[in-house]
Amino acid sequence: MTYHAFLIKYAEIGIKGKNRGRFEEQLINQIHIALKRCSGGRPVRALTRAGAKHDANGFTIDRTSGRVFVNCPDEYDYDEVVDALQHVFGIVGICPVHIMPVVPVEELCAAAVRFFGEEYEDRKVTFKVHARRLAKNYPMDSMEVNAEIGAAILEAYPETRVDVHEPQVMLHVEIRERIYLYSHVIPGPGGLPIGSAGKAMLLLSGGIDSPVAGWMCAKRGLRLDAVYFNAPPYTSERALQKVIDLAAIISRWTGPIYLHNINFTDIQLYIYDKCPHDELTIIMRRYMMRIAEAIAGRTECEALITGESLGQVASQTTRSLAVTNAVCTLPVFRPLIAFDKEDIITTSKRIGAYDTSILPYEDCCTIFVAKHPVTKPLLGVIEQHERNLQEQIDALVEKALETDEILVVGQDEQRILKTREQNLQEGM
């Protein structure tokens, strides 16, 4: 069967009321970006008027009558296009569409029978025809078209039967300026279009949890920047590359991510020297949050995202999280807070991050770990011990921010946008 277009199905966007148009525009923009990878350099046009003509040199995105269609060029890679669309948040279903000219009902019935036969080799199925007559000059209404096509399929394939309540096959027929036939629904990722919910800063480590947390927030429409806390020479270049690779995996859904590589070594060593060792983790986390929030303020991020899960480790008890939160003014999103580890691993595997996450390269969070970390820290006690850091900590934090190395990480690119030296020179 030749598919000339894909119907894009969405769920939540359709109930956004007066804001629906804005969400649709953001969805179309993300589809536009995704299809650029499939167009071989050909243009991708986004059109909103009814009856927009197909551009033979590339893909056309057509929004009309409550539908979004991706019209395809004469030659394209079906699997590549489906894969691209399955990485666009906001899409819940992708329907391959066969398009034909408007013809009399007899010819339409014959075409529908051929379409049904090619789509379903096993004809022992129940089906229902669902017609929409948007072209009001067509001589039959929707119910009459349903009856004619249904009768034709039953006659051609007597092993089938009609079930209007729970059919195994739903054959859709839309009569517009042309006739659209479709049946299969390929699942999309769901969620909301990237950018529709604002922008947030992900604290990205090399573990399993934080990439999943970032992916889940991106699925709800957040555009992501990320910050990684590096601790050379205690962490290796391979640990940094692992985080870059994880950012690249997430970018399949989000587009390019600005990854801030922060040298955290001097801060960690200073905390290790000045503070009780059972409080190392919680105090280090508090300074990570301070630095992440400072970068968020520079980059117009409206929230922080972490991969914390309640009770998973000592720093993720209720009291520990409350003490960590006390240094933040931005909201902190923890989408994994009630997830079991197995749930997180399942999602990590589904998004393709797991094999990279389990590579054996330590990050800064695993280097300076106390044997018996405090699980019920008291905010007043932690703040008192942080006063031991007053002599140098502000200067060390400022140095870490001034030497922030910014990388742009995408599916096809990994490049340094600003080196530590460039940032330092700009701060002088």
Predicted regions mapped to residue ranges:
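Active-site adenylate/phosphate-handling loop in enzymes that bind or generate adenylated species
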Residues: 148-153, 190-197, 268-269, 273-346, ...
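RNA-binding accessory domains that recognize and position tRNA/RNA substrates
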Residues: 1-201, 211-257, 326, 374-379, ...
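A conserved beta-strand->alpha-helix junction
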Residues: 247-273, 363-364
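Structural beta-sheet core signal
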Residues: 202, 226-228, 261, 306, ...
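A short alpha-helix-loop-beta-strand transition element characteristic
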Residues: 352-360
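Conserved G/P- and acidic residue-centered "switch" motifs that form tight phosphate/ATP-binding loops
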Residues: 207
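Small/polar glycine-rich anion-binding or flexible loop at a beta-alpha turn
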Residues: 312, 360-368
